[in-house]
């Protein structure tokens, strides 16, 4: 997984899903804190595809400490 294929690292505090204005924290909030499925997240954020939602969740699952700090816990 090449992170640059999926995300735009604008600043250390601003990581967005490539090709969108959606920050990864919005998707991960729905996944981590609300228990939403990837399908429900894609429906909520209509500009995102499943091919964008899944890598965002995978990035979190593979890097829980780093991404957890980014999203605030």
Positions of PLM-derived features:
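Short, Lys/Arg-enriched N-terminal segment that forms or immediately precedes the first helix
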Residues: 1-17
